[in-house]
């Protein structure tokens, strides 16, 4: 119940951050500064990059809402992620960063905006009686640690290439080179309250591996809710804005139930088993639950050629593979141009696939209303007849 309440609060904060400042203040009045600040600190910790300061320090976040001041200290040191400092942590506070609560809400969860100044206050060595005595030991660490924490306080678009390395997901730099394509097709969704489903959380049967790409999408879509589906229990990957579900991507009933609970989705990414039958089942079950204007993505098309995944090394025998599915969508796009006596009855994909972008091992399928209309029947289908009809009778 507490987890559900927290998830609801996160969604409310995201919604308010995209509205007027008054919406944020009403939310804070309802839930209290402490509860809202807890959500914000959790987000900052998850977004902050790996610290580089070799001298451990504390950075104090002081979040103000009217007369209330909520201080939270973060421990920052090379070799470990940024974390909340324990109550008895007596480390050196190198910097105090003060935000207005409604301003920090909008910085973290509102539509991305560029503001070079005027968003926060800072105090170097806030509790030291004399700063000069600490310069040699803590000055550089203060600068580095503050930069790390402030990097977690922004919604500026991150570098997907860097995120793949940070979160240990092979979407760029090793097996694949997907991130430039993802950046191109996903950037327009960054400021929206998206719901992203990724099939396949990673780590196979290891109980503590996987979840890197979910964290990457959480960081990239700073206003989004991220869902991961896997045949194995990957609940260790759950955190604020990330939900994992145990299920079989080859079970249409499971997928329909998942979509009914968490959809409709703005984006679905199939990075699951890569077994061709599973890819096709997932598409047919989930594409109807992608909202108009959304995207369905299929990774690792190479398995279409591998018999061990249900593929076929002969490209001419690809009908039952993932690539066979992608190729069929070209006909779906053009279905209104087929002769009326073709005997083809338009299916769901025919009516709703409006764009197709295929790269090496990666396909993006755009969802919409595919009913622009075909070339009218009174237009001649024969070249010579078309020329004659279009020439006004001129010989």
Swiss-Prot record:
UniProt keyword annotation of S-adenosyl-L-methionine present: yes
Catalytic activity: demethylmacrocin + S-adenosyl-L-methionine = macrocin + S-adenosyl-L-homocysteine + H(+)
Keywords: Antibiotic biosynthesis, Methyltransferase, S-adenosyl-L-methionine, Transferase
GO molecular function: demethylmacrocin O-methyltransferase activity
GO terms under biological process: antibiotic biosynthetic process; methylation
Keyword Disulfide bond: no
InterPro entries listed in its UniProt record: MycE_N (IPR040800), SAM-dependent_MTases_sf (IPR029063)
Pfam families: MycE_N (PF17843)
Pathway(s) where this gene product acts: Antibiotic biosynthesis; tylosin biosynthesis
Role noted for this protein: O-methyltransferase that catalyzes the conversion of demethylmacrocin to macrocin, the penultimate step of tylosin antibiotic biosynthesis. Also able to mediate the conversion of demethyllactenocin to lactenocin.
Listed name of the protein: Demethylmacrocin O-methyltransferase
Gene source species: Streptomyces fradiae
Gene: tylE
